[in-house]
Structures are given as structure tokens and as C-alpha cells.
């Protein structure tokens, strides 16, 4: 039987035999990428992201599932003077047929990742999150009864809730920021029975998020000229680039990559600063001179990753370079105006990160960076929280344990081991 896909090291070009690998066994500092046997996008009869099952690294769908929706808005187009603006929305809005009850496009990556891990050995994923990713995995855990370990900064605990009581979530709150949560999660992933979710290195995560571009291309009949999104790690933007590469290989949706227009939230803008000088590596003293305080000031905490997959082979630097991309620094005031614009024209309360992306589009339209008749895709990566609260009861997730930012010791691992044993 011909395998559905294989994975290849982007930097070295070699095929990696172990499809569970998160890194190149030859030692290249590089992401791995899926290569699907089917070069043509074949739509399935399933709903949500599994409509694009042929380009997801799983053999069966996880149902029921939601997915991104692509639509246009005459009102928003008129407001910005952009005649061919399309919106990709991953959140909750029954009027727009959007059914992600965690309110975030992180649900797209969680669906693909949970199903893939289940198929590859039923390991329990350990996820570090600034809020949205953790909520997505917790929400699907509650829906499907699959155990997950979520590690978040203490400040993000309030952003973790589900619409079904979560019985299978081990939540660790870390007194620190997102980078500290990543360090703790790395240690916990060594507990037997657990496995690191992988972040940007996880091909299922990227291919799941890439369905936003697949859905847009199918809906519009072509790859858009421009793609707008706010980024913290930039994994979603890498996913958009990779999805576009596959669509070009298909041959029916165009031959040109979309230009990536990516935004960060002032005053924390390390990717903006590094890309302005076309540097592949960060200089912390220039790009993150006062990171702890800068992170506290942003309106969108999920955009504050201090260690994004920027310089790694196949990472965000390469995506920006390949697409002649542009970075935008968006102030909180601009973000709030972007939030009001989406609310007024689409009737959706957007996630703050999506408001930042909208503000970047406003900047680009005003500067003439995008033309009035260009095909543009704005990725509204989350929203609809007010409607979720109207339609569902929300169940907050209480931490199983709270630790300091330097805690990676045996006591914490032993507590997790006891919890994991219930699923053995």
C-alpha cells in the first residue's frame, strides 16, 4: 500500500523515515514538511477541516469537527476601498456558518494533532500555550474524551474554558510568561506516556492551520494575492505559505505565492524589528530590550512569543523571504480601532490578535501597499466569544497544579505520572 504522505527535512532535503519525528535526525536546524501522495486537492464529503482530509497527516477524520469559513463583506470592502477582499474566519458565528466553539483557529491545529497522535500510538500531548491553543486542546479533550496536558502562564488561566465539562485535562499554571510555560512543558513531555505536541515542528499543527488557505482557494477559485494575519510564533503564517505551495503544485489555483503581511502588537515586536533588517537571527538587546514589561503592555498576549520559529530552516524568515513578505507594528489604539471595524461591519467580536491583523490591513490600504483590486485574504483567527457565552454554558478549567517558572523537578513529574496512569 502506498503511504498517504512522507516527511522531508526542508533544509537538508532528506526523507525522514520516522513520521513521528519532530526534528531532522541528520541534525539540520530545520522544520520537517509533509509531502502528500496526492498532488491534487481532493475534497472529501466530511465537514470542517476534514473536507481537506487528503492534505492532512491523518487517515481518518475526527468528527464532528468545525473548520474555517471564507466569505466576503461588501461593508468592510467599501470601508477599506478594497473590491476583492475576502475574510477567513475561524471562530463562532452561526450567521457565518462558523462553528468553532473555542473561538479560535487554534482548534484547527488541535483537531489534526489529536487525531494524528491517537493514530500513532495514543500518546498524551503536552501543550504549552499563551491561552488560545490551550483552550482549543482542552475544548476538544472535553468533546472527545481524549486526555491532554496543558501548560500556561498563570495570567492565561482565565482564558481557559470549555463548553463541555473537561474531565481529562491536566492544567499546569506557571508563574511566568509563555516562554517559561514552554520550558516547563518540555520537561513534562519526558514523563512516560506523554509526548511533546511539538509547536511549529508539528506537521499536523501546520497542516491543520493551513486549511484556512485551502478553504479560501476553493471558495475563491484561486490563491489570493495577499494574506494578512497577526503572529506570535508565526506558525499559522508558515502554514499558509506551505498550503499555497501545495496549491501551486495542484495547478488549478494559480502559480504565484500570496504575499504574507504579518503583524505584531506594539511594544513587543521582535519579528518586525529583525525582518526590517532582514536578519535571520534575533538580537535580544535590539529586538526585545525590555521583553517582560513590553509583554505586559500589549492588548493581545497570544502574540508575545520570545522564541518563535523564525530563523529555523523552513521557518518564518524563509516564509517571508519566499513571499516577499512585509511586517507591521500595530499599536493598541490601532488594534482597538480594528476591533471596532470588524464588530461594526461583520457583527463579530474578534479576538484581539485578529483586531491587530485588521489594523495592519488598514495600514496597508492607506499606504497603497495593496491595490484596490488586488485579491486579499484577511485571516480573522478568532472571535465570537460573546455569542458563545449566549449559546453555551462556559466551564472554567481550574489548574491541577501551580508552579514557579523554574519548576521542572521530580515532584511535578511524579504528580503528572500518577494522572497519566489513569489512562494506561
Curated annotation (Swiss-Prot):
Keyword Protease (UniProt): no
Cofactor: pyridoxal 5'-phosphate
Top-level division of the source organism's lineage: Archaea
Residues the record lists as binding pyridoxal 5'-phosphate: 132, 381
N6-(pyridoxal phosphate)lysine sites (modified residues): 106
Keyword Membrane carried by entry: no
Subunit text: Homotrimer.
NCBIfam families attached to this UniProt entry: cysteate_syn (TIGR03844)
Function: Specifically catalyzes the beta-elimination of phosphate from L-phosphoserine and the beta-addition of sulfite to the dehydroalanine intermediate to produce L-cysteate.
Protein name as it appears in the record: Cysteate synthase
